[in-house]
């Protein structure tokens, strides 16, 4: 949780879903 979205979590919240 946060490993793949380490960069996306900042500007990829909608991209995670």
UniProtKB/Swiss-Prot annotation:
GO cellular component terms, A-Z: extracellular region; host cell perinuclear region of cytoplasm; host cell plasma membrane; membrane; virion component
The record's account of how the chain is modified after translation: The virion-associated Nef proteins are cleaved by the viral protease to release the soluble C-terminal core protein. Nef is probably cleaved concomitantly with viral structural proteins on maturation of virus particles. Phosphorylated on serine residues, probably by host PKC.
Mode of membrane association: Lipid-anchor
Miscellaneous section: HIV-1 lineages are divided in three main groups, M (for Major), O (for Outlier), and N (for New, or Non-M, Non-O). The vast majority of strains found worldwide belong to the group M. Group O seems to be endemic to and largely confined to Cameroon and neighboring countries in West Central Africa, where these viruses represent a small minority of HIV-1 strains. The group N is represented by a limited number of isolates from Cameroonian persons. The group M is further subdivided in 9 clades or subtypes (A to D, F to H, J and K).
General function of this protein: Factor of infectivity and pathogenicity, required for optimal virus replication. Alters numerous pathways of T-lymphocyte function and down-regulates immunity surface molecules in order to evade host defense and increase viral infectivity. Alters the functionality of other immunity cells, like dendritic cells, monocytes/macrophages and NK cells. One of the earliest and most abundantly expressed viral proteins. In infected CD4(+) T-lymphocytes, down-regulates the surface MHC-I, mature MHC-II, CD4, CD28, CCR5 and CXCR4 molecules. Mediates internalization and degradation of host CD4 through the interaction of with the cytoplasmic tail of CD4, the recruitment of AP-2 (clathrin adapter protein complex 2), internalization through clathrin coated pits, and subsequent transport to endosomes and lysosomes for degradation. Diverts host MHC-I molecules to the trans-Golgi network-associated endosomal compartments by an endocytic pathway to finally target them for degradation.
Family assignment from sequence similarity: Belongs to the lentivirus primate group Nef protein family.
Record-given protein name: Protein Nef
Lineage: Viruses, Riboviria, Pararnavirae, Artverviricota, Revtraviricetes
